[in-house]
Amino acid sequence: MAQTQTFNGRRRVRKFFGKIPEVAEMPNLIEVQKASYDQFLMVEEPQGGRPDEGLQAVFKSVFPISDFAGTAMLEFVKYEFEAPKFDTEECRQRDLTYAAPLKVTLRLIVFDIDEDTGSKSIKDIKEQDVYMGDMPLMTDNGTFIINGTERVIVSQMHRSPGVFFDHDKGKSHSSGKLLFAARVIPYRGSWLDIEFDAKDIVYARIDRRRKIPVTSLLMALGMDGEEILSTFYNKLTFIRDGDNWRVPFSAERFRGMKATADIIDADTGEVVLEAGKKMTARMARQLADKGLKAIRATEDDLLGNYLAEDIVNMKTGEIFLEAGDEIDEKTLKILLETAGNEVKFLDIDHVNIGGYIRNTLVADKNESRQDALFDIYRVMRPGEPPTLETAEAMFHSLFFDAERYDLSAVGRVKMNMRLELDCPDTVRVLRSEDMVAVVRTLVELRDGKGEIDDIDNLGNRRVRSVGELMENQYRLGLLRMERAIKERMSSIEIDTVMPQDLINAKPAAAAVREFFGSSQLSQFMDQTNPLSEITHKRRLSALGPGGLTRERAGFEVRDVHPTHYGRICPIETPEGPNIGLINSLATFARVNKYGFIETPYRKIVDGKVTEEVVYLSAMEEAKHYVAQANATIDENGGFADEFVVCRHAGEVIMAPRENVDLMDVSPKQLVSVAAALIPFLENDDANRALMGSNMQRQAVPLVRAEAPFVGTGMEPVVARDSGAAIAARRTGVVDQVDATRIVIRATEDVDASQSGVDIYRLQKFQRSNQNTCINQRPLVRVGDLINKGDIIADGPSTDLGDLALGRNVLVAFMPWNGYNYEDSILLSERIVRDDIFTSIHIEEFEVMARDTKLGPEEITRDIPNVSEEALKNLDEAGIVYIGAEVQPGDILVGKITPKGESPMTPEEKLLRAIFGEKASDVRDTSMRMPPGTYGTVVEVRVFNRHGVEKDERAMAIEREEIERLAKDRDDEQSILDRNVYARLSEMLIGKEAIAGPKGFKKGGALTKELLGEYPRSQWWQFAVEDEKLQSELEALRAQYDESKNALQQRFMDKVEKVQRGDEMPPGVMKMVKVFVAVKRKMQPGDKMAGRHGNKGVVSRIVPIEDMPFLEDGTHVDIVLNPLGVPSRMNVGQILETHLGWACAGMGRQIGELIDAYKEAGDIKPLRAKIESLIPDNDRNEPVRQYDDESVVRLSEQLRRGVSIATPVFDGAHESDINEMLEEAGLNSSGQVTLYDGRTGEEFDRKVTVGYIYMLKLHHLVDDKIHARSIGPYSLVTQQPLGGKAQFGGQRFGEMEVWALEAYGAAYTLQEMLTVKSDDVAGRTKVYEAIVRGDDTFEAGIPESFNVLVKEMRSLGLNVELENSSRFDTPPAQLPEAAE
């Protein structure tokens, strides 16, 4: 085979253990966010033809707005966005919101109204663009920048609009009877509940108000009693037959009935069923087949039936009996006398069909539509007297007015499905047919037909993503605005105004600001590492406005449901009160246009598994039989086994292979991104896997990232989609590289109008939201060929484009002197020495100089009463130098604030006038380093208000920025020149010129040498005879000039932005931000974890020579407790250890082969090793096609340890691990003999040793350790505050008091409760005593005692503190008590 392929070494190659082919492409992991918001803004859509959704729909629903008289109307025409003022980077630096101005075109139409006829004619039309505030834009990574911080809008899970049927599980009534209820939930508008009570009467409730009989609701819809009965019941016709009656026979009605008397055929008179026997379904069917038409009924059989129609005297119109009346002895008489030969009864048998609606109608006091409407009006607006008009209008507005009631397309679709209606999804209000269908379905449920709904089924819960949440919020803002517009239209002279004068866009802009700033779903992005970013964007929350609350959510809502499969991850959810309420989207899941989560399946046609992939929601999936992704498939593409394990209707069953019609696309489709990163997930207990998924999100990016030896193949996907690693936008060649930027010259799909240069700016040591460090490093060299999508730079926690959250370390599972008791972790000093788990954290400090009443604050180096030593790190402007090492208490920015003046004596005034200002008028308010923080200043930013003079430091920063912009411009210009002039010389060489620059002689073709004689800028003066070529030359020139000017214009715009003053909060003149970087090495007290939920705290760091070592003298890095595995059942960590050991062993072998090749020059053994290691299949790299150089490059990468991928649920088996261990020349038990580093003795038995991927978590002891001597006190109780952030003290709580009481340490206790806490006078005295060197003090009354007394007084109990001197008199002298 020709060795044609090259390997550039810029990506990590893994050996894949997965056996199941990947059929479907995994969707982009932040698609949920981006697609939703794009659909809302529709920036790309042409303005005229935008579909009615998102922002367009909001404007369409609120406009047109008419005034109260109908003389004018404001219509919406279109909207557009202008370019945002600042790009994302500038917004981050200047604390601004990344947003684009929204321009809306409105049309004001003024009408002339004819006073006599009332007809309207158009008088005037004006159109105008109106600015409607700024609309935040989403960055490429799916986040928003609000006031300079990155935020994520979390998607919300809520109950889908539509109709739901449920029962109370027998809880409401003591008899345990099931009371059924239906609820119609609109997207917005009034809820309608229809429910049974214990007496089987059907009631309706509107918006959880008082209940009314459902028949009143139906009457209000315009039905009368007879119509209601005929809607819900069939009619049964009894025909008089002499003294008896004939009843039609139907098998359906009589099956399962027990005969009380003989059943006799009305035609033949024979007995078809004797009394006391039961008619089975089969018997009923046989009788019907034999031709039994009717059976005989006596007059007594009429008793207990209900009339279906009124019985009326035709002559007088008098009603003898009403529809729904029950036939008893008295009414039977009337019936026999007045009825004709035919009587219609309601088909109610109290077995299959209950008389609930009929009973409700009888119980209902309302007789007519008017009564019913009045009744509903009284319930909804108690205390107001109803009139027919107001009652009708109110009832109409409740359910039938599109302004007030909106089912939404989803609600209509769900209703159609549940009630088997056929209504287009554009009808968004309720119809009377819908209400009748709801009541009918509810009654059928009560009769035992059909099933109740499962609220937790994902078919009944939908996702509201950013776009939709934003749409609702914006609609609220526009509605607030609409009221103001209406009022203004009526109060203003309408002929003279423009649309702009009517509109105040503040409410709309405020609604947007409020949503992004303070909504529960707008969250500060978790930016600890790339995985935590992605997970945050894919999160689904059941909390938030219109959702559940933690306290009210029961067990069912939080539980895993069968429909979660492939849609919501069953593993990843927080521990604690939010468990199950906050979930994560599964890897392949996507949200459809209705907001339901869909998951992909492969289609199975005629028993063959096809490559065709369909996405199904939970509702659509219910009727299918779905096979697992790991079902064995034979060579023909069919199932190998007769019976296949599959899922159907929420159950796992064995189904014959002919029935199976779908199959999972991938084994990892049921878990989320974080869970899919855990190798051997299938061998971990679910609770530990949950902890593993959650802790990976807390891993701190390390100084040297290292991809795991044992991965799952998801690593590159996360690194790419999170935006941490930079991917090339176009194919091209690298032109320049340094640490801060990469310049690539595009070689493909270069459009004439676009620039042919891509400049990628790398982020260097930027602070993330969690104070971790964002730093990107280039992976490419000048001259490298880059394909579109290649990774060209690594970011935080990525290594060659793979996610790298931790480090591979050599671990031994063994006890070590009790230092790994209770999950503690013992570390080797090598980890600290080699900076293996060292991370950089960046703290931001900000200081503002305000304009105060007493005069402006000033940022300066000239601070009163501060030694020169303390100012050593400040420059002349009073701002710390970059690179200064700072400690607690050091000044970062010098600032002075004017002090309040005390009135001056005339002498002082005189002295003041002679000698000028005196320094004591200002106090030092400099910003100092807080306690417990050390570090190096890495960046300083200075912001000035417009018109405030800039200091030297601000000018220097500005110059640096402009130089950087100029360099970008020059590079782009030089690449543009190179490209254009190369193209120009191509066009000219070999052609005959008819004109040229000065001194050019005509004749002969142009050559490269000839062109070289003239400067490039003069080449444009050559002209050729061929007109077509000449016009091409001119077009090239025009395009070149245009590009050049555009480039210069862009540069000028940016420079102008840099030089312009900054927008500041009111009263702020100047702001300085200082960034301090801290290097945090591993230390005892830091928390570490593996990927399997195996977490622990570092207990001790041991010198390398004392750690246990292997036979070759290698010391282990970390010792874990073997007892942490069996009870926790996370065996994945042991398998990972063994496999990691094998990877490292293989790496050693490859390293030896590389060294041999470098000495001897024979590559064959190395190539054979690599080819045997990475077999040829569609998931692995085609190493057999690599050229020699690529093989060496790949081997160098594998030398530290072979990287492998063991996908979840489709990973390496025990046999694979044994094979790898043997291939690496290691014992297949994975255990080795260890020696004690302190004595050199062998340990008693072999120990499991291997490589495990450990993470350093964000719970660092440096952030938690804290000490206080004197600090702030609480205002009311005068006790010290609590917590590190408040510089608080340690609470000596109730139990600690008990401990001191138990010891009898009375004085210590008194001290704790008084002078060390809230005895104000006492603690000042103690301080003074200590200063004097005296150690005696006296305790007084704690302030909290005074608070208690005050509180008791507020309850009316007068508590007074008696002075003890009254009781000092001896008892004998006390006045004697009266006898």
UniProtKB/Swiss-Prot annotation:
One of the record's GO cellular component terms: DNA-directed RNA polymerase complex
Statement: the UniProt record of this protein carries the keyword Transcription: yes
Keyword Protease annotated: no
Disulfide bond annotation, renumbered to this chain: none
CDD domains: RNA_pol_B_RPB2
E.C. designation(s): 2.7.7.6
GO biological process, one term: DNA-templated transcription
Keywords recorded for this protein, A-Z: DNA-directed RNA polymerase, Nucleotidyltransferase, Transcription, Transferase
UniProt similarity note: Belongs to the RNA polymerase beta chain family.
Function: DNA-dependent RNA polymerase catalyzes the transcription of DNA into RNA using the four ribonucleoside triphosphates as substrates.
Protein name (Swiss-Prot/TrEMBL): DNA-directed RNA polymerase subunit beta
